Amino acid sequence: RTLQATMPKIKIVETIWDTDKYPRASVYAQQTDLAKMHCTGDWLLYLQTDEVIHEKYLPEIKSACEKYVADQRVEGFIFRFEHFWGDFSHVNRSHNFYPYEMRIARNLPQIHSWRDAQSFRIFSQGDEFLPDYFVKEGTRKLRAVQLDAEVYHYGWARHPATMNSKN
């Protein structure tokens, strides 16, 4: 709340995580949709807590958002992903790790987070909260432009002291 007091654009939204109603990690998608309801801009930048974008990519991102804001054919932007593994110096590029993913989507009511909030899809059903975030029928992928920018994913990395304590 201290950060919110100094930065008025930050809004803290208190929620309840209902894992019974939204099973199989779809509660992440439901919570993403809940946050989306509080957004007001043309584009939504979505990062999970273990993801960051280096500031060197900000000019590319800003330029693309400005260039395509009036082009309704573009519904989102795809980023390359670097998955750090074990520590902060090693990257895993095996087939088990997604090399690209959407992290910017248009702020449209028919665009919803999908599955476990890994990506976004257009849903023909425009409800605020969907009964099943894993359904493919009646949905489609967003039309997207790939950016020359990366998301660094640290979900599988640990501080060296933590890794050394495992020995």
Language-model region placement:
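Conserved catalytic core of Hanks-type protein kinase domains
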Residues: 38
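Catalytic-site signature of metal-activated, phosphate-bearing donor transferases
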Residues: 25-33, 54-167
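Short aromatic/hydrophobic "clamp" motif used to bind/position activated sugar donors
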Residues: 44
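Acidic donor-binding segment of Leloir-type glycosyltransferases
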Residues: 1-23
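The conserved acidic donor/metal-binding loop of glycosyltransferases
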Residues: 48-52
